[in-house]
Amino acid sequence: MTEGGEYSPAMMSAEPFLTMKKMKKSNHNKNNQRRFSDEQIKSLEMMFESETRLEPRKKVQLARELGLQPRQVAIWFQNKRARWKSKQLETEYNILRQNYDNLASQFESLKKEKQALVSELQRLKEATQKKTQEEERQCSGDQAVVALSSTHHESENEENRRRKPEEVRPEMEMKDDKGHHGVMCDHHDYEDDDNGYSNNIKREYFGGFEEEPDHLMNIVEPADSCLTSSDDWRGFKSDTTTLLDQSSNNYPWRDFWS
């Protein structure tokens, strides 16, 4: 600079270099001021573990103890909280990811187990339906057999009722004096008249005399209108009385007519 206060050309050409030098020196001092020593970082870490946020009064006190500006302490705590949150989120993410993988594995296992149970349930359902159908078919077959048997039994009963003969009381076997046997029964043909019915009873009672037709013919002989003489009538009456007496010796007439 000249006495008149003007810069010489040489000084003007050297001034930019001086300005740049001053700026570099100022930046170097700032970088030195931003760097923290190991002692300072250790103290700040210990304080951060106890408190993630500091009150303004504690910031000033900590900065004075460490030989730092309060703003430096605030910036360090702010950056530390950001890194801590990021690390915490990463840790939580890893935990959640591991839990998700475990749940996904369990879900796949449960899904396979469900498919197996559904298949087993379907198989049991089909088996139950098949068994039910077989039981229904068997029950229907049994009912058909019972119905057929009942129908056949009713048909047999109806046929037996149609074919069943008239109820006959036990036959009464009779024996005369000569050892001949005869049978007395009370069944008769309803189309016969009273005389025919009486003749049947007599024939069955006196069955032993069927072997001796001549004897019976001698007892009762047909005549045109009446007996020819009183002797014949007395002979017939005597023979008839004798016959009845012989028969009544073996079987009382009371028992016969009772």
Curated annotation (Swiss-Prot):
Q: Name one GO biological process term.
A: positive regulation of DNA-templated transcription
What name does this protein carry? Answer: Homeobox-leucine zipper protein ATHB-7
Question: Where's it found, cell-wise?
Answer: Nucleus
- Which organism is this entry from? Arabidopsis thaliana (Mouse-ear cress)
Region annotated Disordered sits at 149-183
Keywords noted in UniProt: DNA-binding, Homeobox, Nucleus, Stress response, Transcription, Transcription regulation
Q: According to its UniProt record, in which tissues is this protein expressed?
A: Widely expressed.
- Region: Leucine-zipper; residue ranges are 89-124
Q: Which gene encodes it?
A: ATHB-7
